[in-house]
């Protein structure tokens, strides 16, 4: 507590407009429902708990003057760990790690964290739109094909398993697929080449909200479209389309300001495209990269 107060004093010397906090993984009386706050938790201006958002209701009653924040939240539990919080009294959360990065690999051949909703170049993965549906009032719908179910993967005692998702609509004829439609409005209709596969309502249950699951969706070449409606009016669409075979590679650097000093690092996104310039998500060819220069 003393060190925190000294650091807060230093911070307020430069900026006294902001509240301060410390991320904590709290002790508990009951692991599922009831925390046992340390002295530091009571001393901070904002009570920040890693993962244990289920303790907020009890601690809100004990400390009604406090503001609460989920300082680390698991991407595996996305949805419930946001919607189950009493959002009028909780200022939000931070998903860890929402962006992939080098380091903290879960094993070779990975060189870094790969459980985020954005890759290392900030390209959104399908479930990034699930996060957007929580925080944005702009109507949206987004299709995510479930390629592989998550397995129980522990990292520092937290389950970090995530499903492998894609937007790939190049499949095998007759394949039966499971998918999500992420949305923040009332209902979604799924259409395959113009034929309706049904309409599903957005569930108010925090464990299901904004994430509608569809099973046994038949594949056929063409277009799979999700149409979102609010109060009966179409407010958003998203579609996946079958592409041709990959015939070229498109390279896009993150910036044109690249210094050839042997130290500067540049992210270059390599995309396989078909004859119409569309991204081919089914392309898994091994690439050989050669860099020349002085």
What name fits each language-model region?
Residues 189, 195-199, 284-294:
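Short, well-ordered beta-strand segments
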Residues 29-31:
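Sequence/structural signature of outer-membrane beta-barrel proteins
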Residues 279-282:
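Short acidic/proline- and small/hydrophobic-mixed sequence motifs that coincide with surface turns
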Residues 178, 267, 286:
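Broad gene-expression machinery/nucleic-acid interaction feature
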